């Protein structure tokens, strides 16, 4: 499965191939600081999951190649929107589906195509950020059982972090709802070295590494008792 390669089809593989540093030729190849905000309707039901992915400086610099340096804000945003549309189309691939799953108990919750897609550039940090929202096809309540949001790239091409104090927010949640962040498992040194040895064009992971990669999911558990 080359979902992570398809995700950023603007040339990440080319970037990994031409850079000679050790970090450029090891899994993972991209680092994202993520944020999740859970959105509710007036009845207290979860209706959408908003996400922001802030990309590392190396990928941000590469993705901005070719953009006009002296363009005004409107022209620059138009170019960034084009990039965002390319990324979100790749992310919509059924095999990756935004690297995000929602579930309640043993039931997977269906979500629609990403909406409110926007790419922004922060000149202070020199990083690009992708913002999008995933609407649930049917609103759902967490009164009887928790709802879990999971974010992971099963090929470990992309590594996520949700360490910021405001990484998980519920601005429109009912007062009784609480969202808890459950971090992924920690890789042991041997597994980390095996992943680091994989080439940038590696698609499917070996079966044992694929199983381990699944344990690296970042989970947000919503409870509304």
Regions found by a protein language model. Name each.
Residues 31, 93-95, 215:
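Short solvent-exposed loop/turn micro-motifs enriched in small/polar/acidic residues
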